Swiss-Prot record:
Residues 1-146 form the MGS-like domain. This is Bifunctional purine biosynthesis protein PurH. The IMP cyclohydrolase activity resides in the N-terminal region. Pathway: Purine metabolism; IMP biosynthesis via de novo pathway; 5-formamido-1-(5-phospho-D-ribosyl)imidazole-4-carboxamide from 5-amino-1-(5-phospho-D-ribosyl)imidazole-4-carboxamide (10-formyl THF route): step 1/1; Purine metabolism; IMP biosynthesis via de novo pathway; IMP from 5-formamido-1-(5-phospho-D-ribosyl)imidazole-4-carboxamide: step 1/1. It catalyses: (6R)-10-formyltetrahydrofolate + 5-amino-1-(5-phospho-beta-D-ribosyl)imidazole-4-carboxamide = 5-formamido-1-(5-phospho-D-ribosyl)imidazole-4-carboxamide + (6S)-5,6,7,8-tetrahydrofolate; IMP + H2O = 5-formamido-1-(5-phospho-D-ribosyl)imidazole-4-carboxamide. HAMAP family: PurH. SMART domains: AICARFT_IMPCHas (SM00798), MGS (SM00851).
């Protein structure tokens, strides 16, 4: 039996050469409908109309053409399944081996300034996506093409494999097909949302709307929160407090990412590697500390910068008990997130009725996606998260003097923090506590001045971390003048030698990590 290709396309580009190659070179029978069939017939190719194949005419003004068991049965039947083959034989259904479909031009239609609602609705394809998805599902036996850009790739592969479509190509085409239909449906959903709200999310993905927020970063901005119901922040339980805001969620994200540097556990089932607390303001950590206990870590984090902690967001990496809860009530805070809160802690914190308490289990974090997505004008930027493991054994000592054992611990602590600070980023730290943070300055030495000023006299004997290399030796010399004894940075500047020379002159130790951690 000759293989069968079903062709039904809105974009006729490359259609005739493809059909000619399939029929005349590879012996395919051509099955088609509507305008596609007419183009093929005019090119002198033998075509079986879908209506003749099914015995059912097109109805509802063309809304129903291919939605028929003789079409979908032929596409979905598994060739190696005896029961499927018996069904085909009993119903007199011929297998369909290739589906070439591109969809109604919905995006092009809605791009017209004078488009009406009814015109847009009529350009929502139904039968096309159904055939594409059916063929993609059964890619073990069926090849599916959704774009003229794929035709040459298909014909080249068929020529190289004696007329068959390689299984690897069928799988890749299936992947592209599912992405194609997902994008198509997203465009429809986005357009309908825009019609309903006058201004919708321009890159709405297939993520459920969790909540319409009070406003965005500022009161004049509208905002919505889309989230998987059980993953990431969608899996958090708000125990008390006011409704979450856009800024709350952004700060919570920053606080959680920072505190996870020290492990994240709950109820002792997956204990944190070291009790840690983080205070965040405007997505930058302003106080971070580890301690022998959760209350100790919290007190040290707040003491790092109590002025900036006012109105802040706090993340802790283990269960919050009553002692820590009492510390939390000592100042005004927006939100606290932790793996859990004891009943006694809940009772203490209930006195702060507006304080938002969020319980976020490690399981909700573990299943969160691996990508960082940001919107730009007309598109999206998608990158890997900057969460690779920190491995001090890979670092090198650039200075004549190596860091002492305590300096090594402090340098690792500071390096864990600096990648969570907006660039240009500088962190001053000592004994598992941040002492000063310089964030978001346009030059590195400016961030260093801010961090060192915040640390004050505590900078004596502390270390300094920089998220990028030192372009000049000015930061090293400034750090030494304030009592810093060791520095850490990625290295890679043409003038690394100047900074290393300054360290040697001033008695500082310098470690190079070889990895930059810019955060924009």
């Amino acid at each position: 039996m000759a293989p069968v290709a079903l062709l039904s396309v809105s974009d006729k580009s490359g259609l005739v050469p493809l059909a000619e190659a399939l029929h005349r070179t590879h012996g395919y029978q051509l099955l088609s409908s509507g305008g596609t069939a007419k183009v093929l017939e005019q090119a002198g190719l033998p075509v079986t109309r879908v209506s003749d194949h099914t015995g059912a005419p097109e109805i509802l003004g063309g809304r129903v053409k291919t939605l028929h068991p003789r079409v979908h049965g032929g596409i979905l039947a598994k060739r190696g399944d005896a029961s499927h083959q018996a069904d085909l034989e009993q119903q007199n259904i011929a297998p369909i081996d290739m589906v070439v479909v591109n969809l109604y031009p919905f995006r092009e239609t809605i791009a017209r300034p004078d488009v009406t609602w009814d015109q847009a609705i009529e350009n929502i394809d139904i039968g096309g996506p159904a055939m594409v998805r059916a063929a993609a599902k059964n890619h073990a036996d069926v090849a599916v093409l959704t774009s003229p850009d794929q035709y040459d790739r298909l014909l080249t592969a068929m020529a190289e494999s004696g007329g068959s479509v390689p299984s690897a190509l069928r799988r890749q085409l299936a992947l592209e097909a599912f992405n194609h239909t997902a994008s198509y449906d997203t465009a429809i959903g986005r357009w309908m949302a825009e019609q309903a709200t006058a201004k919708g999310c321009p890159w709405l993905e297939a993520v459920p709307l969790r909540q319409t927020l009070r406003y965005g970063e500022n009161p004049h901005q509208k905002a919505r929160w889309f989230s998987h119901p059980k993953q990431g922040w969608g899996g958090a339980i708000q125990l008390q407090g006011k409704e979450l805001s856009t800024n709350n969620l952004l700060d919570l994200e920053a606080a959680l990412a920072t505190v996870r540097e020290f492990g994240y556990g709950a109820d002792g089932s997956a204990p944190a590697s070291q009790p840690a607390a983080v205070v965040v303001k405007h997505t930058n950590p302003c106080g971070v500390a580890v301690g022998a206990s959760m209350p100790a870590a919290l007190t040290r984090a707040l003491d790092a910068d109590r002025v900036s902690a006012f109105g802040g967001i706090i993340a802790m990496n283990d269960v919050v008990e009553a002692t820590a809860a009492r510390e939390l009530t000592s100042l005004f805070l927006e939100c606290v997130v932790a793996p859990g809160f004891t009943p006694e802690a809940r009772e203490v914190l209930a006195a702060k009725a507006n304080l938002r308490l969020l319980e976020l289990a490690p399981q909700a974090i573990d299943v969160a996606g691996p990508d960082h997505v940001r919107s730009i004008l007309g598109g999206l930027l998608v990158q890997d998260l900057d969460d690779q493991a920190i491995t001090p054994t890979d670092w090198t000592v650039a200075s004549q003097r190596p860091p002492t054992p305590q300096e090594k611990l402090d340098l690792e602590f500071a390096w864990r923090l600096v990648r969570h600070v907006r660039s240009n980023a500088i962190v001053v730290a000592k004994d598992g506590q941040s002492l000063g943070v310089g964030a978001g300055q346009m030059n590195r030495v400016g961030s260093a001045r801010i961090a060192l000023e915040a640390a004050g006299e505590k900078a004596q004997g502390a270390v300094l971390a920089s998220d990028g290399f030192f372009p000049f030796d000015d930061t090293v010399r400034l750090a030494a003048s304030q009592g810093i004894t060791a520095v850490i940075h990625p290295g890679g500047s043409m003038r690394d030698g100047d900074s290393i020379k300054a360290c040697d002159e001033l008695g500082l130790a310098m470690q190079l990590t070889g990895r930059r951690h810019f955060l924009h």
